Amino acid sequence: MYGDVDKIGVAIEWHDFRIERSFNWGRTFHPNSLEFCLNLNGHGAVGGVGGTRSDYLPGNCGYYALADGPLPASRRAHDHHQFVTLEFSREHLRNELAQNEADLQPEIRRILFGRKEENVVAPARPMTLQQRSVVASL
């Protein structure tokens, strides 16, 4: 829909697909990024294999941050997947939010301005009515 994380540090992507086999969603994630997912339909999971796991059910949203290494994630077979991802390079967000660092939620502040870059998986939660409205308008 918009942008390119590698070139300008930001991208908004609409995903609408059906799959017959489980899909390795994690291979689409960008290194050193913070990504927000608004999941309208389909089942997905981010994390696991010794770390925190968050399940994306229809109507859920959440975020995950990548360091240099991969982050396991999958999309379930036989589902109709519809979701939006807002993808940002950590560097882009650091530059844009440096003057507002104190206003950020503690976990987001740690992801962007902490001393150690690491993979982070936040718990998915139900989308608000406003978030649903924005996604439905795309």
Predicted features along the sequence, with ranges:
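N-terminal low-complexity or simple alpha-helical regulatory segments
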Residues: 1-43
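Alpha-helical bundle regulatory/interaction domains
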Residues: 43-138
